[in-house]
């Protein structure tokens, strides 16, 4: 306890001693400063009255002027009474700690490079801060100096803008005693802010605070809106580009498809040419076979004429007649099924010329579509190049190039679709025309040859046919694979199959008279129906009529004497299909007759042919349904009663003809017959 008391006494004594020394030192300073201060105050007052005489009697203004003078002294290092540019720059950098004092330097000097005390005072008086009210000073203290805790002190002292220079100088009495600022950092901060305000005017933050806030908000809104707009435009441009790329890919696929169709078209044309060559070879082969059949018929004719067996000749003639009838029946059916009308040769050339002219217009339309496709491709490539640049996406998004390219692509695609549809319709139409006319139209010698063949003025045709350039195609033509089939290529398999069938089918033998009558009635019905649709070619019908008009319908001796295979062969037309069927049947019938002649050599050479004819038509025939003609017995009696065989044969032949006519008119009275006209007897004019 004693130790603590002693320590407290020693501390108290030391404090009192230190306080006494400081008081004595301050008293001495006051005495010396009072004498020097009196002289400085007199000089300051005289200078202030010289500079601003109306305000020299105001104590507050004197204090403010003295503060401005002290600020000038701080800046004037060489003490020559003027502050030059270097001195002000050094003061701003060292005392005010401005790293880039360019703006402040220009504001302080303006156009005057030397600043005196008078210039500095006048600049202070013209400043906006000089006229600040108490509220404005307090606002400056809160917002700029950021010392709101001294607001009450400033309000009590009623400090206005006139007192600002006193705050800008180091004054312990003003800051410590009057303002009661105990914190040294607060005093230094207040001094620096006040010095900046006195020298350079009010701070910009205080003067334009709300405006800057508003501009900042507006800038933020504009920035956010711009970013959002850029994002929307970027997404829209990407979607548009994707759509355009899809259209472009579809256009490429259409081009490839059109190219494939063109290749298939060329391939089909090559097949057409091959089929045409095969057809020519087949016709040549059929003509050779016809010539062989003619030679064989001539040989059989000579053989039949040289035999002395009358009965075998009669039977041979009947078989020959049956085969000829069957061959003519088949030939007529073949005629009905394969030929109805033959167009003239000039029509083929005119149709070929029409096709070539249409191809010219089609090529022009196709070239226009290709040109539109090329323009669309170039536009797409330009957009791709623009997107690779820095602002390419924004430029593409704000310009109308995307819409233009999209429109060009759609236009090109529509043009390609029209070209494809025109190609499809043209192929189908000319295919049907070829089928109906029966000759080639698409494959032709060319427009120049056709113009020369038809004796047309070349100036009527205009420009020459453009060569088809690089052919393109749409997505819709893949269904045309089966449509590019030539009519001749479709007809040639049936032609070959029919020829093959005629070469391999078994030859018909001798049939019953009932079957022949039934077949005649059915073929006549079929012929009557088909004649209404397709008329028979005149040359083939005329040849068949001439061949059949030379024979009777029941095969009497008149056929043997007047009609023979050689004459029938000569009267038949040159059609390979019809003539081949006829001569194959004829050849087969003649072979059978020849074999029968060899099997029956016992018949006497002078035998009456009436016996053979009556035997072939008598009830003892192998077919029980064969009708017996009325004139058979008459022929037998006539042959027995007469001594001249030729007269008896002629008489029996006439009676047999009458009997056959009566049989055809009287048999089957309940059924209506439609006999073929080639089996009718020729009318005598």
From Swiss-Prot:
It is found in: Cell membrane; Endoplasmic reticulum membrane; Sarcoplasmic reticulum; Cytoplasm, Cytoskeleton. It comes from the Eukaryota. Keywords: Calcium, Calcium transport, Cell membrane, Coiled coil, Cytoplasm, Cytoskeleton, Endoplasmic reticulum, Glycoprotein, Ion transport, Membrane, Metal-binding, Microtubule, Phosphoprotein, Sarcoplasmic reticulum, Signal, Transmembrane, Transmembrane helix, Transport. SUPFAM superfamilies: SAM/Pointed domain. The modification Phosphoserine is found at residues 257, 512, 519, 521, 523-524, 567, 575, 602, 608, 618, 621, 628, 660, 668. Residues 672-685 are annotated as: Required for generation of inwardly rectifying CRAC currents. Residues 670-685 have a biased composition (Basic residues). It is a single-pass type I membrane protein. Residues 32-41, 490-499, 608-620 have a biased composition (Low complexity). GO terms for molecular function: calcium channel regulator activity; calcium ion binding; channel activator activity; identical protein binding; ion channel regulator activity involved in G protein-coupled receptor signaling pathway; microtubule plus-end binding. CDD domains: SAM_STIM1, SOAR. PROSITE patterns: SAM_DOMAIN. Residues 64-97, 102-126 form the EF-hand domain. This is Stromal interaction molecule 1. It comes from Mus musculus (Mouse). The lineage of its organism: Eukaryota, Metazoa, Chordata, Craniata, Vertebrata. The gene is Stim1.
